[in-house]
């Protein structure tokens, strides 16, 4: 199901992190036919309720000062997004060519019924296998760069690691922000997700510093 307008645009001459993520976004869309939307970097936004509680959630920038929530939903089909961690590291390999390293995660949320006609089994391992095979393909990142997969998370609270959904579930505090509705609708078959943590090390992007 897709009922939300999503505005995916790419910078003409991206640098550094934007360059790496745009390349990966494009390869995800080209290689995964079941993926409806490949978002770029997510940003951590906050909602405040009348009781003073703060709810943190990931959101993608959609242009014109608009953000789209990336919490579990069926508004724009199967989707992915990047969660990038601080800090990003720069190692002075040489004055003209420092090494740039960043860590993050690629998150997928999808509806199995939209991918497989057979619902007698749960096909999350097949999805995971397909994604990992793509991400470990030689040349998946360009130039003098290397992508390393470090961890894979599949439990719902871990997929949204670093956001309020993780805290709510780990503290057994099932209240607020429609969490009960998420339980009944999105945290069971046919919905599923993946959080694939990675690091990317590159040198060629930092050449822009020397211009």
What do the PLM-derived regions correspond to, one by one?
Residues 93-101, 105-151:
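Extracellular/virion structural assembly segments
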Residues 87, 111-113, 201-203:
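Short, flexible beta-strand-to-coil junctions
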Residues 56-71, 143-161:
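A broad, low-specificity signal for short, low-complexity segments enriched in glycine/proline
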Residues 84, 108, 196-200:
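Hydrophobic side chains in beta-strands
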Residues 79-80, 104, 196:
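A broad, low-specificity signal marking well-ordered, structured residues that form hydrophobic/aromatic
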Residues 43, 54-55, 66, 142, ...:
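Polar low-complexity intrinsically disordered regions enriched in Ser/Thr and small residues
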Residues 1-94:
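Small/polar-rich, solvent-exposed N-terminal microdomains that initiate assembly or binding
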Residues 1-38, 95-99, 149-211:
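Short, charged interaction patches at domain edges and termini
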């Amino acid at each position: 199901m897709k009922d939300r307008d999503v505005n995916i645009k790419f910078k003409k001459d991206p640098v550094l992190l934007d360059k790496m993520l745009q390349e990966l976004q494009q390869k995800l869309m080209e290689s995964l036919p079941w993926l409806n939307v490949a978002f770029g970097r997510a940003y951590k936004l906050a909602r405040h309720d009348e009781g003073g509680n703060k709810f943190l959630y990931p959101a993608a920038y959609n242009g014109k000062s608009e953000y789209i929530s990336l919490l579990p939903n069926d508004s724009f089909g199967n989707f992915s997004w990047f969660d990038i961690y601080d800090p990003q590291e720069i190692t002075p390999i040489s004055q003209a060519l420092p090494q740039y390293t960043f860590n993050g995660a690629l998150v997928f949320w999808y509806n199995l019924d939209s991918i497989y006609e057979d619902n007698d089994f749960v096909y999350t391992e097949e999805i995971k296998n397909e994604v990992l095979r793509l991400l470990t393909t030689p040349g998946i990142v360009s130039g003098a760069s290397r992508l390393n997969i470090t961890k894979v998370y599949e439990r719902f609270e871990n997929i949204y690691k670093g956001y309020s959904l993780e805290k709510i579930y780990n503290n057994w505090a099932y209240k607020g922000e429609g969490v009960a509705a998420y339980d009944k609708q999105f945290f069971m078959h046919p919905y599923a997700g993946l959080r694939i943590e990675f690091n990317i090390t590159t040198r060629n992007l930092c050449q822009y510093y020397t211009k």
